[in-house]
Amino acid sequence: DELVVNISGDGSFQMCQQELGTLKAYDLKVINCIFNNKNLGMVRQWQDLFYDKHYSHVDLKHGSPDFVLLAEAYGLRGHKPETRADVDEIIKTAIEDEAATVIDFPMAYEMNVWPIVPPGASNMDMMGVDNCTLTSKQRETPDFDWEQV
């Protein structure tokens, strides 16, 4: 009975897009928001930040499906905003609709995701969380209140 929203990049969505069949088979309403930058974004970002821009197998410009048509092939709803003005109406429609929905949000190819964990680092050493630095005492406290950050 709760609203369920899946936020995914286009690369990760393609790793489990067959689950659209599960949504249809069990009549589950999930709003799938795909942030589509036409590449394996986190892998590309790692290669950009840590491997001197030696890009390998991250470009999806010529190998991605039309996600709207893919949703419709499963009998689900599919939307792709063409302008910023379309976004609010599409989201409103998806929330009101009884069917599962795929929304393909176009993003800039170079757009990065923050925070990110550098290679070999722990989740406690994320980059891009300057305002969320934990003290060693907070790291040891299992019931740490993130509202204090």
Task: Give the role of each language-model region.
Residues 1-149:
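Thiamine diphosphate
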